[in-house]
Amino acid sequence: MNEKIDTVIIGAGHAGLTMSYFLSERGLEHVIVERGRVGERWISERWDSFHFQFPNWTIELPGYKYQTEDPDGFVPGGEIVRFIQEYADSIKAPVRSGVNVTALESSSNSTRYLVRTNVGAIEASDVVIATGQRERGIIPPFSCVV
């Protein structure tokens, strides 16, 4: 038997956590599946000396602003990771780390989707793909009828 939930968010970065925030505010059941850890791309795909490319005063997620004594400075990548992880904790985001999505299919009931993962399948009414701006998308064949 597949787990059933209203919404599955794929990816626990800025976009996925922001979606989680707004779904939670509306009392909508959801889960975030993340192949690595919260903010994984900031952890594993940036060089050690990387700094955020926008001034500190611009760093904000819904209901959560980056606190700094230098609003015009540029925060190091490690601080961004901490900020994202603290945000996930503060909004009590329902993140499942270490869950790799292997397929997304329309389920036998055409109004739902089946998210296949390395730890089982989740049936959902809605799926939000928040895997990052440089992710190579694979568009499922059924998407033309959605």
Residue ranges of model-derived segments:
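FAD-binding core/adjacent interface of flavoenzyme oxidoreductases
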Residues: E3-I5, S90-V146
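Conserved Rossmann-like nucleotide-cofactor binding loop
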Residues: A15, R37-V38, R134
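Short amphipathic alpha-helical segments
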Residues: S20-F22, I43-S44, I139-S143
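Dinucleotide-binding Rossmann-like beta1-alpha1 core, especially the glycine-rich loop
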Residues: Y66-P71, G78-I80, Y87-K92, R96-T102
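N-terminal Rossmann-like FAD-binding beta1-loop-alpha1 element of flavoenzymes
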Residues: E3-I32
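Glycine-rich, phosphate-binding/catalytic loops in enzymes
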Residues: R26-G27, D48-F50, C144-V146
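Alpha-helical scaffold elements within enzyme catalytic domains, especially in hydrolases
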Residues: F22, E86-Y87
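Glycine-rich active-site loop/strand segments that organize a redox cofactor
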Residues: I43-R82
